[in-house]
Amino acid sequence: MKKTLLATAIAGAMAASGAQAATVYNQDGTKLDIYGNVQIGFRNIEAENDNGNIETQNDVFDNGSTIGFAAEHVIYDGLTGYMKIEFDDFKADEMKTAGRDAGDTAYVGLKGNFGDVKLGSYDTLMDDWIQDPITNNEYFDVSDTSGSGSSVVAVGGEVETDQLTYVSPSFNGLELAIGTQYKGDMEEENVTSRGNASVFGGAKYTAGNFSVAATYDNLDNYEVTQTGVDNKQEFGDRYGVTGQYQWNSLRVALKYERFDSDLDNVDSVNFYGLGARYGYGYGDIYGAYQYVDVGGDTFGNVVDDATSGDSPSDTASDRGDDTYNEFIIGGTYNISDAMYTWVEAAFYDREDDEGDGVAAGVTYMF
């Protein structure tokens, strides 16, 4: 389940507010909430086996069961400090034998008339403003530069760590954001002998039921080979634009996202996405379509490429001609205010149907 769906009452958090969070302390301007969920599902997916072949595989799995703590304290009128920490490596389907050795989100921040600033590990600006409006689903996701879905290029979860982000207050509907990710020379994942800071930022404009957002990240902390590091080769940039419109219970969003590669033998990738979600009273039904253009130059002739039927390539040298048509459909049904079920199906248009599958599950929130 996407982190933005978790229930929490902290005003400074990016997660949605919900009634399930339990306020355990609220006195003298200090508030502490405890919240969480148990998510268990079943999936049947075309995946690679130990021999490198694609075959149908299934299992009962934990879909991100989480427990979280959120606190805030009024420092003085117009300035509030806050923190949030979540743990989601519980493996609820194998609780008796599975270890718990990983967290999910942890940050501290200040918010007030000046805006909002926070430091720690959390969803990126690209995830919140660009990717989530298209597919904020339970399990399956379309491909993107963060590694979701059957992504052909991705930076992985490391991009969410060691972040410092400032978001301005709204100026007649306009919000501005700027941030950095810093990796010091003591970081294990730092392949250089010095500290390094990336730069990311964006803008979001809201007018009534319509909003549009644009973000950019120079990904300056990433490399793929030691040779690239030694030659001072750049990894590449990523950027995106998303527009969305909310009409009663229907939300429709359009996305353009691009990884602009500076690496030898690694192609740039364009992601063109369309997503919709409709609340029917007892839950949501939703779907998304995305056209993935590997090796494309900016927008290119998208319609012509999509209808020409470029097929996946077996070799990296030919992969610049690949295009994929991805589809995801799903729905939820609310059993109660705290419990719901869901079912999803995904089609990624990869060779041997890799990644295609169906999944269903149940979630209980508190």
UniProtKB/Swiss-Prot annotation:
State whether keyword Endoplasmic reticulum applies: no
Keywords, sorted A to Z: Cell outer membrane, Ion transport, Membrane, Porin, Signal, Transmembrane, Transmembrane beta strand, Transport
The domain of life is: Bacteria
Annotated membrane topology is:
Multi-pass membrane protein
Instruction: Tell me the GO BP annotations in alphabetical order.
Output: monoatomic ion transmembrane transport
Q: Name one GO molecular function term.
A: porin activity
Q: Where is the signal peptide?
A: 1-21
The record, for InterPro entries, names: Gram-neg_bact_OMP (IPR050298), Gram_neg_porin_domain (IPR033900), Porin_dom_sf (IPR023614), Porin_Gram-ve (IPR001702)
What CDD domains does the record point to?
gram_neg_porins
Give a single Pfam family match.
Porin_4
Its annotated compartments are: Cell outer membrane
Does the keyword field hold Nucleus? no
Task: Cite the SUPFAM superfamilies for this sequence.
Answer: Porins
The record's Gene Ontology cellular component field reads: cell outer membrane; pore complex
Q: What does this protein do?
A: Outer membrane porin that allows diffusion of monosaccharides. Also allows diffusion of disaccharides and trisaccharides, with reduced diffusion rate.
The record describes its quaternary structure and partners as: Homotrimer.
What family does this chain come from, according to its entry? Belongs to the Gram-negative porin family.
- For this entry, the protein name equals Monosaccharide porin
Species classification: Bacteria, Pseudomonadati, Pseudomonadota, Gammaproteobacteria, Oceanospirillales
